[in-house]
Amino acid sequence: MKIALDVMGGDHAPAAMIEGAMLALEDSGIDVGKLFLVGDETTVEKELTHLSYANSKIEIVHSEQVVEMHESAVKSVRQKKKSSISVAVDLVKSGDCQAIVSAGNTGAAVAASTIKLRNIPGVERAGIASPLPNENGPCNIVDAGANVDSKPSHLLGYAIMGSVYARHVQGKKNPIVGLMSVGEEDSKGTDLTREVFGLLKESGLNFIGNVEGHDLFETPVDVVVCDGFVGNVVLKSCEATAKAMFKWLKEDIKATPIRQMGALIAKEAFKATKERGNYETYGGSPLLGVNGICIIGHGSSSPRAVKNAIRVASEAVRHHVNPHIEEEMARSASLLG
């Protein structure tokens, strides 16, 4: 299996990306035949020398440009054809690689993948599936930011693709699907969610109805469907809340010696709780619906997060997620219109 890694994308690139690649290759549980490190060749070689690392499974692919985080997605893809993200996607398009991993500009990764790879037959819009911790295992929010404006058929597509991913990659036998709304009743929500509710009822998916924000963590649900605007706000709000809670907890623990002693006793419990919600554990989010596997990592990805993003890419390829998506989209063609 060959995977392209955009080593120039991310807040801590290229060091974190290259270290993550090393960790992935050293992990026997991750199936990677070769990793293509896409970036400035001199910079990559310098970093590998600094880390005193050499591996026959690594190949450097030179790219002359970098898409910065603030740049316009579509514009950057069209004007920076030799950027690391574009070159990495080209490797998938040509068949030299089966997947791409990037922690760079999310919009650029989405634009490059959809423009160059095109969508799987039957897929109108690709969607990002971002995992959140849930009592039933990972709960995938689809779409988490690829498209801020969506039609009912797009959300139905997200539900189908999310279910395929949960079943074949995450091992959920009969994935539970919920529709993000402001109340459980089917009459609640916007015109969009009410129409999508009807489509999901007819879809044959394991649809449990509307879910609210608190259901993301409390209710057994594997796929939560929403448009990219809502999904991205939910995802970032959850991340910010978790970060703030642990910050406040640390401050309050330091307030008295007794609390500090208690914290030492409960240290392992705090560590386990933090790990459940740590984005590094999940690695990255798949862009479902494009003709190739694209995994989008957190902008501040650490080496461990990069390693796990490579693992996610490997598993998506190994479980043939895209052929399964094409099959299910064809089966639901009448509903998708």
Report the location of each language-model feature.
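Glycine-rich phosphate/nucleotide-binding loop
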Residues: T114-G127, P131-I141, V223-V224, G228-G337
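Glycine-rich phosphate-binding loop
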Residues: L91-V110, K188, T193-L199, S203-K274
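Glycine-rich phosphate/diphosphate-binding loop of Rossmann-like nucleotide-binding domains
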Residues: A13-A16, S28-F36, T42-E45, L51, ...
